[in-house]
């Protein structure tokens, strides 16, 4: 690839201050070249690894009740590291179910302990703009966003950015588009 450190440096120079990575090791490498960046771990975290994430101020994207429970119980008093909440709005692969999201939103004590900085979902069919699932996911995400007032939201992945501004919410997550991928039919 292009190398995580050179890419992170270039993105910081261009004004990017939020990153999404898959693995903690990638987050640590970005932290070394972008000390002030907000870094999310899309794959959540391995049970028992909360302390390491807190040490490097890496924010897990929580996508299961077990991850929610462990992160809420983690001692973050000296390092107030936040998290993101991932809700499955139709991809049927990652994230809390809508029922789990509603339960979390109602559990005010747990929600306060988590201190979520972002609510996300992932578009399953954004690379096919006319696919009806895009609209269904948008509506589902709007509904779940209402459950978490004041928490910034992110729905658009690379292809989702090209679906239009209504999919952008507070933060778009360009990934492969940064490297020139094109998402257009015809």
Where are these regions (language model features)?
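N-terminal active-site wall of soluble small-molecule enzyme domains
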Residues: 1-58, 62-71
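Active-site loop/helix belt of alpha/beta enzymes
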Residues: 1-14, 68-82, 87-186
């Amino acid at each position: 690839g292009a190398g995580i450190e050179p890419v992170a440096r270039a993105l910081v120079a261009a004004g990017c201050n939020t990153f999404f990575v898959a693995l903690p090791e990638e987050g640590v490498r970005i932290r070394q070249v972008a000390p002030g960046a907000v870094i999310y771990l899309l794959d959540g975290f391995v049970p028992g690894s909360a302390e390491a994430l807190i040490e490097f101020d890496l924010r897990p994207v929580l996508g299961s009740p077990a991850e929610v429970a462990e992160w809420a119980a983690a001692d973050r008093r000296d390092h107030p590291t936040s998290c993101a909440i991932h809700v499955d709005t139709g991809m049927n692969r990652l994230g809390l179910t809508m029922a789990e999201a509603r339960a979390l939103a109602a559990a005010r004590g747990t929600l306060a302990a988590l201190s979520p900085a972002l609510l996300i979902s992932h578009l399953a069919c954004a690379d096919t703009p006319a696919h009806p699932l895009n609209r269904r996911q948008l509506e589902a995400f709007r509904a779940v966003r209402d459950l978490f007032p004041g928490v910034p939201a992110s729905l658009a992945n690379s292809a989702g950015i090209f679906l239009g501004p209504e999919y952008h919410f507070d933060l778009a997550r360009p990934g492969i588009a940064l490297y020139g991928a094109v998402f257009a039919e015809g």
